[in-house]
A protein has these predicted regions:
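The beta1-alpha1 cofactor-binding region of Rossmann-like NAD(H)/NADP(H)-dependent oxidoreductases
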Residues: 8-9, 25-38, 77
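Substrate-binding pocket helix/loop in short-chain dehydrogenase/reductase
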Residues: 61-81, 183
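C-terminal substrate-recognition "lid" of short-chain dehydrogenase/reductases
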Residues: 195-219, 224
Length: 228
C-alpha cells in the first residue's frame, strides 16, 4: 500500500501503522503526482487499485452584503479555482495517471486490470449556502464517473464514486461536542456520524465486486442536507 498526502507527519505515521509507504504529494502539482507514483511503484510495484480522497472546501457565498456596512463582495475567483484544482483536477490527474499505469499490467483471469474509487460528497446533490465551489467540484466528480468508466472499459479498469455524508474525520474532531452532537442528530438513521471503516467497507466492496462499474453511491444515513 502507498499513501499520498500533503501532511507528512500524519502520512508517515499512518503508513508505518499500516505497513505501507508514504509519498508527500500535493495533487495540484503535476510533478509531485508523477514523483509520487514513481516512488510508490518502485517500492511496491504497479498498483491495481486507486482510492482518491483528497479534498478541501470553504464557505463563501457567490455574492454577499455585509450586514454592518452594506459593502458588497463576491466569491474570490482564486479561492473558487483552488477548490476546483484540488478536488476535481487533482482527482482526475491521479485517476488518469493511475489508469495509464494499470494499462501496462496483464489482465487477470476475468479480464480486469484494476479498479478506481473516487470520493465526491452529498454536497454534489445537496449543496448548501456558501458551497458553490465545493458542490461544483464534487458534482463534477460524479459527472465524470460514467464517462471515465466508459473510457477505460476496453482496458478492464472499473471506476466508481462514493458520496459520503457527515463523517467523523479529523476536521470534525476539532469541533465542540455540542456541534458534533447536533451534526449527528441531523442524520435520519443511524443518528451518528459516519465512521471511516464504513467508507472503507464500501470502497472495498466496489473494488472487489467485478460487476460494479460506473456508479456513484451515497453513504449518508439517508441525510438530505438543508440549505444551511
Amino acid at each position: 500500500m502507498a499513501l499520498f498526502d500533503f501532511n507528512e507527519a500524519a502520512g508517515l505515521a499512518l503508513a508505518k501503522e499500516l505497513g505501507g509507504v508514504f509519498c508527500k504529494v500535493d495533487v495540484t502539482s503535476e510533478e509531485q503526482v508523477d514523483a509520487g507514483f514513481a516512488a510508490a511503484r518502485a517500492a511496491i510495484g504497479q498498483e491495481r487499485v486507486l482510492v482518491n480522497c483528497a479534498g478541501t472546501g470553504n464557505a463563501i457565498k457567490t455574492a454577499s452584503r455585509d450586514k454592518a456596512t452594506g459593502a458588497i463582495r463576491h466569491f474570490p475567483i482564486a479561492a473558487f479555482d483552488r477548490i476546483i484544482q484540488i478536488n476535481l483536477v487533482g482527482t482526475f490527474r491521479c485517476t488518469a495517471k493511475s489508469a495509464a499505469g494499470m494499462m501496462t499490467l496483464p489482465p487477470l483471469a476475468d479480464g480486469e486490470r484494476g479498479a478506481i474509487v473516487n470520493t465526491a460528497s452529498v454536497a454534489a446533490q445537496d449543496g448548501q449556502i456558501g458551497q458553490a465551489a465545493y458542490s461544483a467540484s464534487k458534482a463534477a466528480i460524479v459527472g465524470m464517473t460514467l464517462p471515465i468508466a466508459r473510457d477505460l472499459m476496453g482496458e478492464g479498469i472499473r471506476v466508481n464514486t462514493i458520496l459520503p455524508g457527515i463523517f467523523d474525520t479529523p476536521l470534525l474532531a476539532g469541533l465542540p461536542d455540542n456541534v458534533r452532537n447536533a451534526l449527528a442528530a441531523s442524520v435520519p438513521f443511524p443518528k451518528r456520524l459516519g465512521q471511516p471503516d464504513e467508507y472503507a467497507a464500501l470502497a472495498e466492496f466496489m473494488i472487489t465486486t467485478g460487476y460494479f462499474n460506473g456508479e456513484s453511491v451515497r453513504l449518508d444515513g439517508a441525510i438530505r442536507m438543508a440549505p444551511r
